[in-house]
Design a protein with these regions (language model features):
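Conserved catalytic-core subdomain
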Residues: 42, 218-257
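Active-site cores that bind ATP or allylic diphosphates and position pyrophosphate for catalysis
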Residues: 75-224, 231-236
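Short, surface-exposed acidic
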Residues: 33-36, 206-209, 243-245
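Short alpha-helical "patches" and their helix-cap loops
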Residues: 2-9, 211-214, 257
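Residues that form generic nucleotide/phosphate-binding pockets
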Residues: 24, 57, 80, 96, ...
């Protein structure tokens, strides 16, 4: 097992958060063979230290003509009439900057032409094969099928602030670290379909996936940081044991104890 620190969002990822994450995971009884605290064969284990790997992948995708520069803002995409909301993550990209030919990088409407040697300054999107079915068998949820261009659109692989996007970074890391199984929440099913396309484009084999059911409150809402959900640290302070935290579907102890 590998512990990887996905710290590309430098505004929200601070050293004290990494230390707290490691402490909480060890308290839960989770052990790993490699990670930022113990090193290993496939380091470094912080994404902020792996830019060279991501840039090489960006160059491969650019040379193969499967990504293109995009000057659209989030507001542009959200307001586009042809961009229905996908529901779980982001609007469907309307294709405003998508070139007609795979290797044409000319921006529309006379906008600034981006450098083909430096990804910074514009977003770079992966051109999905419209109509193609992406199929995989989830180890928990069973057979899955999503259609590119319908269930998700062209997605960002490199951000305008010159930082690789999540989708590209995790694919590169999974391949470089020889990851064979990925366990994560069911809210990332569409991300898995996107990542499978990236694995194929880069010539890698995708790992197996196990998408867990989400932890929800009594009203059925997903517990998340942005909703002020309780952290493991807070549960520890409230007196929960590691067994109570780890028990799926278990009854929560009294809050005040």
């Amino acid at each position: 097992m590998i512990l990887r620190n996905e710290d590309l969002d430098r505004q929200r990822c601070r050293a004290e958060f990494v230390s707290a994450m490691i402490e909480d995971l060890r308290w839960l009884g989770i052990a790993w063979n490699e990670g930022p605290d113990c090193g290993g064969q496939f380091g470094p284990y912080a994404q902020s230290e792996r830019r060279a790997w991501y840039l090489e992948a960006w160059e491969q995708l650019r040379d193969r003509g499967v990504i293109y520069p995009c000057t659209c803002s989030r507001k542009d995409v959200a307001q586009a009439a042809a961009a229905p909301n996908e529901g779980d993550d982001e609007p469907l990209y309307p294709g405003t900057c998508r070139p007609r030919e795979l290797r044409s990088f000319a921006p529309p409407d006379g906008r600034r032409r981006p450098s083909l040697h430096d990804p910074g300054g514009v977003n770079w999107r992966f051109r999905v094969p419209d109509g193609e079915e992406i199929r995989f068998t989830d180890l928990h949820l069973g057979p899955q099928c999503m259609v590119a261009g319908r269930d998700f659109g062209d997605f960002i692989v490199w951000r305008r602030d010159d930082v690789p996007a999540y989708q590209l970074a995790v694919v590169v890391d999974d391949a470089a670290m020889r990851i064979t199984e990925v366990v994560r929440g069911a809210d990332l099913l569409k991300s898995t379909a996107r990542q499978i396309l990236l694995f194929r484009a880069l010539g890698f084999s995708a790992p197996d996936y196990y998408h867990c059911d989400l932890v929800r409150d009594e009203a059925g809402a997903r517990l998340a940081k942005r909703h002020d959900a309780l952290s493991i640290r807070r549960l520890r302070e409230l007196g929960w044991t590691r067994e109570e935290v780890r028990e799926p579907g278990g009854t929560a102890p009294e809050w005040g104890r």
